Amino acid sequence: WQDYKPLDAAVKYAILQQTESGKMPISLSYYGSVSIGLQGDEMYGPGVEYRFIHRISYINQFIVARKFSEKLSLQVAPTILYLNSVEYGYKNLNYGISAGGRFNAFGSHSLIFEFDHLLNKQDNEDFNAKPQLALGWEIGTATHAFQVFFANYKGILGQRNFVYNQNDFTEGDYLLGFNVTVRF
């Protein structure tokens, strides 16, 4: 994990927008990402016939979201991911489900959560990923959002977290994270 250095490009496209009138009750978006690993060839191990294409991985999601009230928003996203090169015992093609939400506690303060679960099993039972869970607090301003969260996954790429996560939130395997985003 620590030797993995990704270059990531992502796109998100709104297909449908929820309307206040209720004529369209949901929002639907497509999210896709392509990642290229920038680590050295030695990461692939001795005796491996290495090619550039082994560095590439993909994730695709259709995000179905709904704002139920001024306080509560939820989303669910079927997920397909593909890693061109995987360690022995893992599958290249994987599928999962993501769910997330936000509850506006008061003012610009919100509780947020995300849950991701890999639905297919790996070739080796010992390598099945643990579900991912993140619980957080967000403070929003006109131009920034500050997030502090506890999560049981440590990677920056969803496709690697889905497949390789071995941390169990219920066993105390969690990390503290912090994000700052700027709105333009």
Model-derived segments and spans:
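Active-site glycine- and acidic-residue-rich loops that bind
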Residues: I53-R55, Y90-N92, K121-Q132
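Transmembrane beta-strands of outer-membrane beta-barrel pores
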Residues: W1-K5, I15, G32-L38, I80-N84, ...
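A mid-sequence, solvent-exposed acidic-amphipathic segment
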Residues: L72, V76-L119
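Predominantly the C-terminal beta-signal and adjacent terminal strand-loop region
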Residues: N124-F184
